[in-house]
C-alpha cells in the first residue's frame, strides 16, 4: 500500500515557484540539474532572462563575461547560462525542449565552439552528464514527422544512456511512425514524475557566483565604452 501511495503521489503535479534571488543565483551557476530541468528556466525566461547556450567558455568569469557586463551596466536583460564543459549541440538541443513556449519570438545567444565539430560528433561520456530523460519525454511528446526531428531522434539513439521505453519511442520517430498509445501513456506519466523531481531539486547545490560577478564588475569602467572595454580585454590578456 505504501509503495502504491508513493507512486500515486509522484504522479500528482507539484507546482512551485522560485524566488527572484534563487533564479538570479541559478542564472550564473551552470548547474547541471537546472540545465536538465524545465521549471527554473521557464520562470527565468518569462522574467526577462536571456538564455546563453554554450560550453566551457561560459565558465571563465573574467570582467568581460556577459553576466558581468549585464551586472555592471544594468542591462534590461540577465544572461541565463546554460552549458559547461562537454555540452555540445546535441545536449543543448535536448535541453531546450522544455522551454519552447517561453522562447517563442524571443532572443537567445548561442556560442558555438569549434571543438564541437568532429567526425565522431557528440562524446557519449560528456552527453551522459547533461542527458535529461525529462527533456527526452518533452521532445518525444511534441516530435513531428519531419527531417529535423527524425535526425535528432537518430542521434539520440546513438547515445548509450538513452534506454528503455524512451529508446523504443525514439526508434518510432526515426522510422516516421506515430507513438503508440502505451508509449504516450508511459511518457506522459514519466514526464509528470520527472517534473515533480525537477521542481523539488532545481534549487539545490547552486553555485553562488554573485560575489564573483560583482567583484569582476569593479574592474570595468563606470561608463560603458567599447574602447575602454577593449583596453580592459588587452590588460586581462596580458596577465
Language model regions located:
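Membrane-embedded segments
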Residues: 58-148
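Short, small-residue-biased leader/transition segments that mark boundaries at the very start
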Residues: 1-6
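Secreted/periplasmic serine-hydrolase-like ester/acetyl group-modifying domain
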Residues: 137-239
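Membrane/wall-proximal cationic-aromatic binding patches
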Residues: 15-77, 95-96
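Phenylalanine-focused residue identity feature
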Residues: 18, 35, 45, 49-52, ...
Amino acid at each position: 500500500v505504501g509503495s502504491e501511495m508513493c507512486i500515486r503521489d509522484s504522479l500528482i503535479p507539484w507546482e512551485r515557484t522560485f524566488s527572484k534571488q534563487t533564479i538570479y543565483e541559478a542564472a550564473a551557476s551552470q548547474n547541471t540539474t537546472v540545465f536538465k530541468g524545465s521549471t527554473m528556466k521557464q520562470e527565468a525566461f518569462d522574467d526577462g532572462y536571456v538564455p546563453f547556450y554554450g560550453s566551457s567558455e561560459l565558465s571563465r568569469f573574467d570582467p568581460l563575461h556577459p553576466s558581468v557586463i549585464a551586472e555592471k551596466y544594468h542591462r534590461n536583460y540577465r544572461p541565463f547560462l546554460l552549458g559547461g564543459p562537454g555540452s555540445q549541440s546535441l545536449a543543448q538541443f535536448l535541453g531546450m525542449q522544455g522551454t519552447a513556449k517561453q522562447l517563442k519570438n524571443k532572443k537567445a545567444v548561442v556560442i558555438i565552439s569549434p571543438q564541437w565539430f568532429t567526425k565522431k560528433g557528440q562524446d557519449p561520456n560528456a552527453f551522459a552528464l547533461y542527458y535529461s530523460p525529462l527533456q527526452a519525454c518533452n521532445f518525444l511528446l511534441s516530435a513531428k514527422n519531419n527531417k529535423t526531428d527524425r535526425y535528432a531522434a537518430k542521434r539520440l539513439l546513438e547515445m548509450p544512456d538513452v534506454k528503455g521505453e524512451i529508446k523504443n519511442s525514439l526508434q518510432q520517430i526515426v522510422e516516421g511512425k506515430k507513438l503508440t498509445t502505451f508509449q504516450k501513456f508511459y511518457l506522459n506519466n514519466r514526464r509528470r514524475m520527472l517534473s515533480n523531481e525537477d521542481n523539488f531539486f532545481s534549487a539545490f547545490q547552486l553555485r553562488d557566483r554573485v560575489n564573483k560577478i560583482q567583484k569582476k564588475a569593479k574592474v570595468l569602467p563606470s561608463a560603458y565604452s567599447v574602447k575602454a572595454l577593449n583596453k580592459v580585454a588587452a590588460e586581462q590578456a596580458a596577465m
